[in-house]
Amino acid sequence: MPELPEVETVKRGLSKLIIHKKITTATSDNFKSFPNLPEEIEAFLLGARIISVRRRAKVIIIDLDTNYSLVVHLKMTGQLVYRGEENWGAGHPNDSLIGDLPDKTTHAKLEFSDGSKLFFNDQRKFGWMKLLATPLVEKLPFFQKVGPEPLTEQFTTEVLTQRLQRRSKSRIKAALLDQTTVAGLGNIYVDESLFLSQIHPETLVGDLTSEQLERLTGNIKQVLQQSIDAGGSSSRNYVDADGNRGNYLDGAYVYGRAGLPCRLCGTPIEKLKVAGRGTHICPICQPAPATTNQPTAKSTSITPKTHHKRG
């Protein structure tokens, strides 16, 4: 599933193409993928202009001048593909990104007044697109539960500490994967952030020091921003319509590098299973806690490797 940087990349790509466009037709072949009644679509979608594209957690929100919004969750295999003055798309890498559309994976289509089109494709039909009154978007159960946005100024060490309090007996990796703790974090960026923070993923939340939490807050922000600058990182299951893959993983610290030398100390990276997920660590830079009450942490600081932006 795409994580925050991949969805942010989609948001930025869409913003350049569809803002100010007028929607003239909207079709869907699957009510689960686009669960709105025809009368809702006719009243609030047809004839509407797009005024903004934004992101909350892993969800895209397309705001309309009718005070309604299209809320889009790509889930595992979703795609958004634009065909018009230029072709663009992002999502699960199959032929639908570059082939003729609509095809058998297309479950919704928007057509604009200039003849351009936006297709919502989803091979496994887990993703969805919903039309809602804009004031109701933040009241969706998903948004009511999701944690704070990590790239905002409001996301501080104090906020992270408060969000983790109810998970004091959980392993830190499990707590960070919980979307009610922090929005948009997934397996890749949790592993990377914990490595930079010198925290073993099996450390209990209640055993973390204030210094560790401060480092973790900053490194979550840093890793996510580096990945956005690199165009994302889900190279196996997330590409754009030109076949470009986010290149964050080319310079990843630990994720996907089992058996390779740590970029800092040279020790082979190990792969464990924590919280039911494959987990990558350096056993020297991230020593396992001696006991659940006394986690071990090195005192030396880490100077992160610079990730290169996509050229």
Language-model segments: which ranges?
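Basic, nucleic-acid-binding surfaces and adjacent catalytic neighborhoods in DNA/RNA-processing proteins
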Residues: 22-41, 54, 88, 159-311
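Short, glycine- and charge-enriched coil/turn segments that flank and shape catalytic ligand pockets
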Residues: 40-44, 65-67, 86, 137-138, ...
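A generic structural signal for well-ordered coil/turn residues at beta-strand boundaries
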Residues: 56-58, 104-106, 142, 258, ...
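Short clusters of hydrophobic/aromatic residues that line enzyme substrate/ligand-binding pockets
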Residues: 45, 143-146, 199, 238
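Generic detection of long, well-ordered alpha-helical segments
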Residues: 1-4, 100, 150, 154, ...
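Gly/Gly-Pro- and Ser/Thr-rich, intrinsically disordered tail segments characteristic of DNA damage-repair
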Residues: 1-129, 302, 307-311
